[in-house]
Amino acid sequence: MISEPLTLSTSNPVLAAKGLTRRFGGLIAVNDVSFTVQKHEIFGLIGPNGAGKTTLFNVMTGLIPASSGNLIYQNENISKLRPYQIANKGIARTFQNIRLFGELSAVENVAIARHIHSRSGNPVLSLLAGIFGLPASNAMERKTQRKALELLDLVGLGDRAGEQAKNLPYGDQRRLEIARALALEPQILLLDEPAAGMNPNEKHKLSEFIREVRQQFNLTVILIEHHVPLVMGLCDRIAVLHFGQLIALGEPAIVRNDPAVIEAYLGDES
């Protein structure tokens, strides 16, 4: 099993996977995976198709339960929590397959996420306020709309706020998903193949955008991405999965030259 040396930078992580395993019948999709992620880090997760990357994301965000192992977030075991509970703790994600509300406008997509965040404290009172049109509810609606528009401006979609999500170009839909995730005001942002379908220029802009978002929101970012040059140039550290197992972990220069990685993944890149 790949392990990290205990150093000052890894002794108090914001997130720690400890022996995470996920079985589907006789198939082991994620096999005893352990790693730590530090606050404000951009942490990459790479590997061939079928390596278990998205399954690991699904376990980490509560969409599917781990068969064994634990996920520790800010010294709390969140392994048994449901997705909405994990989101309320401060972990948000995007998906490999875009999951927007296509019939709704861009600003409405972001506003929905803001509602989830702002009303998590007392949903019953918030519901009653909305039903009866109380001033507090009206003020919240205005604040939600204003924040949603600010986030769209941040991701470069301010001029398309009123367009239906389904009519946006693919790259803009990706940015809208990120804006929606940011609306939850997360501490950790998980991005599942954010550069999928983008041309080289768009990928370069995405890298710069992720750095800017990390800085502006004081985020920790964990991303899955198939475009190896993007990951190598963007991430502080990288973990490599192969057939569900962690085969390498470290800074980009170390991972790039790891023989196991070259054989399993990087050697297949054109």
Task: Locate each region found by the language model.
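Glycine-rich phosphate-binding loops of nucleotide-dependent enzymes
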Residues: 2-270
